[in-house]
Amino acid sequence: MTNTTTIDYSLDASWILPVVPHQRLFKDCSLLISRDRIHSIVPTSQSLRDYTVRERISLPGQLLMPGLINCHGHAAMTLLRGFADDMPLETWLKEHIWPVEAQWAGEEFVRDGGELAMAEMLLSGTTCFADMYFFGEALASAVHKAGMRAQLYFPIVDFATAWAQSPDEYIHKGLKLRDTYRSHPLINVHFGPHAPYTVGDAPLERIAVYADELHAQVHIHLHETPEEIESSIKEFGKRPLQRLADMGLLTPLTHCVHMTQTSAEDIALLANSGAHVIHCPRSNLKLASGSCPTAALTQQGVNVALGTDGAASNNSLDMFAELQAAALFGKLVAGDAAAIDAHSAIAMATINGAKAIGLEDQLGSLEPGKQADVIAIDMNDLDLQPVHNPVSQLVYTQMGHRVSNVWVAGEQLVKSRDLTTLSRKEIAANAAQWREKLGAKR
């Protein structure tokens, strides 16, 4: 009698893209999962012969890869999808977004918008997302219920909102939320100062001290428009990036979101600091904010990850669309068709994202011992044939709607395109109610 090893899941697929090692692709293999961890990748013939499995899932013509990591967004703002379009950032924020948020942002808005965002992200292959928004306690509760993975960056601004009245209160509430979820397996909480133009020196200096003491990340919109740079030079005599560096806020724990206005000196400063750049190409394109020089950044060793930004400015949370835009936009900006190749674009949405959020040892690739955050993509559709190169199809075709199954920490959250922990019907009904509420005030 042959001895066999017992395992929880065997996902038997036509292709497995582990991301690490780089450019490796397995054919006709199985991903073995034990509890919440990846056990190994073996030929399917070996899985059938040597393993007793609790559940075997056959995925012919499908590809397995790590779940995508959306490194910047505002989940609640999914309720503002299409609310204000075709205008520059300052007009969009000051005349449309901030006024409606002042009236409506609250726990119900954050919960309903967050659930809508999570449903969209899960169905398009995102398993972990970073979020910066008010009422983080409401989103954290929704994330826990959904079983998704999240990095929550509590916002700090100089002005009052429905959530807090002063920078000190934002920090106090944020640290309380961080303490609440300190031991949660799927949720982490860090600092999210909104931007250099909305947070003064004193709060930023306090954040630098706290972040250093707590070894906490700092997530900030930075160098998003030419006007931001010009205003900073006029007021402070320096560019925003240098201002942060002078305060001790530019470290390997810093996320510089957008970075569309970037000089050679900025790139050198980023590279020397170890800070991460979060590239949001589709939002930047829509707002005409500028272009992030991803090829130049990566050539200098800067880690570049991807985010969708909020659906209010994108208008989609599909990370496959984002990584495609990153690849195409990166080639155009560099003037080089070989810049940001398909594998590099996928790395930005997976292992680079894991590096940025400090979870490289747990997420971002299908390696033994890592968390079983896995997605399956159906490659059987006619418009993908012939599949000469599955990785090319992942990046250069429309892929998000082809995600068939999703696991987070070994738990199946999408099964044959159906959500298992969230209710489509309830989420759609809530979104319709918000459309009526928000539309009545326009």
Curated annotation (Swiss-Prot):
Question: Which Gene3D superfamilies does the entry link to?
Answer: Metal-dependent hydrolases, Urease, subunit C, domain 1
Per the UniProt entry, the signal peptide is none
Which reaction(s) does its UniProt entry say it catalyses? S-adenosyl-L-homocysteine + H2O + H(+) = S-inosyl-L-homocysteine + NH4(+); S-methyl-5'-thioadenosine + H2O + H(+) = S-methyl-5'-thioinosine + NH4(+)
Give EC number(s), comma-separated.
Answer: 3.5.4.28, 3.5.4.31
Report the co-factor binding details.
Binds 1 zinc ion per subunit.
The keyword Cell cycle belongs to this UniProt entry's keyword annotation: no
Q: Which InterPro entries match?
A: Amidohydro-rel, Deaminase_MtaD/DadD, Metal-dep_hydrolase_composite, Metal_Hydrolase, MTA/SAH_deaminase
Keywords for this entry? Answer: Hydrolase, Metal-binding, Zinc
**What residues bind substrate, as annotated?**
101, 194, 224, 309
Please name the NCBIfam families in this protein's record: PRK09045.1 (NF006549)
Record family assignment:
Belongs to the metallo-dependent hydrolases superfamily. MTA/SAH deaminase family.
Q: Which HAMAP family match?
A: MTA_SAH_deamin
Function noted in UniProt: Catalyzes the deamination of 5-methylthioadenosine and S-adenosyl-L-homocysteine into 5-methylthioinosine and S-inosyl-L-homocysteine, respectively. Is also able to deaminate adenosine.
Protein name (Swiss-Prot/TrEMBL)? 5-methylthioadenosine/S-adenosylhomocysteine deaminase
What organism does the UniProt record list as the source?
Answer: Teredinibacter turnerae (strain ATCC 39867 / T7901)
